A protein has these predicted regions:
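A structural signal for well-ordered alpha-helical segments within the folded catalytic domains
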Residues: 2, 100-103, 107-114, 156-157, ...
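Polar, surface-exposed loop/tail segments
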Residues: 2, 13, 126-132, 171-245, ...
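Residue-level signal for well-ordered alpha-helical scaffold segments within enzymatic catalytic domains
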Residues: 3, 7, 111, 115-119, ...
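Active-site-proximal cap/lid insertion segments
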Residues: 4-128, 132-178, 191-199, 291
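Short, solvent-exposed loop/turn segments at secondary-structure junctions
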Residues: 19-24, 94, 137-139, 146-147, ...
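Bilobed periplasmic-binding protein-like "clamshell/Venus-flytrap" ligand-binding domains
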Residues: 110, 219, 300-313
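C-terminal, low-complexity/hydrophilic appendages and adjacent surface loops
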Residues: 154-155, 223-285, 314-316
C-alpha cells in the first residue's frame, strides 16, 4: 500500500487496503502486550442470552459447553473449532486470553494504518486525500457466550467509522447517530464531485460531514440473508446452528436507539439501547412495546419495497 501511494502520488487514485486481522485465529504480533486478567469485560461476558432468538441461544450453548460442561476435546465439533481458534475456551481465563489476543490483533492493524497515513504525508498529498477507516464486522469475544459474528448484537454489528476529508475540516468531530456502510460509496462520489449512479441504494453523507444536516432521522438497516445449505460445518458449530443460520434476518436501528430484529422462523428481538446497551433483556414479547414494534416493522417493510428485498417477515 505504501509503495502504491508513492508510485501514484501524482495522479488521482483510489486504494482499498483490507487486513485479515482482527480475525480468528487471533494470533500475530503483540501477543503478550495485554494482561488477560486486566482485560475489561461487560455484564454480557459469558452470559447466555436466555431471552434472545433460538439461534443465539443455540450458539451460546454450543460455545459455553466447553467451559461449563467439560466436553471431550476429541469430539469432531470441538476439534474443528478448537483448531480454528487456536485458543483455550474451556476456562474463563482462556476466554480472557482470547480477548487479549484480539486486542493484540487490533494493535497490529493500528500500526499498519499508521504506516499508510505516514505514506500519505510523505507523498505530500495529505491535504487532498480522503481517508476512511472502518471494519466489516465486530466479534462477540465471549459476550452473550458466543464467538465471531453472525449475530445482530452490538458486539458483532456495530463498528468504528472514521472519515477524514481535509478540505472540509482540520478539526476532529464526533457525529452522533448511526449510518450504514452502504452509504460510503455515494458519500465518496459526492465528496469528489462525481455523479452518484441511480442504482446505488445508499445515500450521500456529505451534508452531514459539512454540518448542514444531522442524523436525527436516519434509520439503519442490517440484513442477514442466511447461509447456503452447501456451507460446511466448520466455524459454524453444530448442525442445528447451521440450520438456524440459513434463516434470513432483517434489523432496524432507529435514531432514538431502539433495535428490532425480525426473522420469520425464530424468536424476534427488541432492545432499548439507551437503557440496555448490552442487550440483556429482549422486549419483543412485552405487551407495552406492541405499537413500537409495529412502527419499526413497518419501516423495515418500506425499506424492503425501496430496495426490492423479498425476505419473509413475521406478522407483527
Amino acid at each position: 500500500a505504501c509503495q502504491f501511494i508513492d508510485e501514484n502520488k501524482d495522479r488521482p487514485f483510489i486504494l482499498y487496503v483490507s487486513t485479515f486481522e482482527p480475525h480468528s485465529p487471533y494470533h500475530g504480533p503483540f501477543m503478550d502486550q495485554y494482561d488477560p486478567e486486566k482485560i475489561p469485560v461487560g455484564p454480557a461476558f459469558l452470559k447466555k442470552p436466555d431471552t434472545a432468538s433460538l439461534v443465539n441461544r443455540v450458539r451460546a450453548d454450543y460455545f459455553m459447553q466447553f467451559m461449563l460442561d467439560g466436553v471431550d476435546q476429541t469430539t469432531d465439533d470441538y476439534a474443528m473449532n478448537y483448531a480454528a481458534y487456536r485458543e483455550d475456551i474451556t476456562t474463563e481465563i482462556g476466554w480472557r486470553t482470547l480477548r487479549a489476543h484480539y486486542l493484540a490483533n487490533i494493535t497490529s492493524v493500528d500500526r499498519m494504518v499508521g504506516k499508510v497515513n505516514q505514506a500519505i504525508k510523505d507523498a505530500g498529498i495529505e491535504d487532498n486525500t480522503i481517508v476512511v477507516f472502518t471494519s466489516e464486522h465486530g466479534d462477540m469475544l465471549g459476550d452473550h457466550g458466543m464467538l465471531e459474528k453472525r449475530s445482530m448484537f452490538e458486539e458483532a454489528s456495530r463498528v468504528p467509522l472514521v472519515i477524514k476529508v481535509p478540505w472540509l475540516s482540520k478539526k476532529q468531530n464526533i457525529i452522533e447517530g448511526s449510518v450504514s456502510h452502504i452509504d460510503l460509496v455515494p458519500t465518496l462520489l459526492d465528496l469528489i464531485g462525481e455523479p452518484i449512479p441511480g442504482h446505488l441504494q445508499g445515500k450521500s453523507l456529505k451534508p452531514v460531514l459539512e454540518g448542514e444536516k444531522d442524523l436525527s432521522d436516519n434509520d439503519v438497516f442490517v440484513s442477514w440473508n442466511g447461509y447456503d445449505s452447501a456451507v460446511p460445518d466448520r466455524f459454524l458449530g453444530a448442525h442445528e446452528i447451521n440450520r438456524m443460520l440459513r434463516l434470513p434476518w432483517r434489523t432496524i436501528i432507529t435514531p432514538d436507539r431502539w433495535k428490532l430484529a425480525l426473522c420469520a422462523g425464530d424468536q424476534c428481538e427488541l432492545y432499548d439501547l439507551n437503557n440496555d446497551p448490552y442487550e440483556m433483556e429482549n422486549l419483543f414479547n412485552n405487551p407495552e412495546q406492541k405499537d413500537r414494534i409495529r412502527d419499526m416493522a413497518s419501516r423495515i417493510r418500506v425499506w424492503q419495497v425501496d430496495t426490492k428485498d423479498n425476505a419473509p417477515l413475521p406478522t407483527t
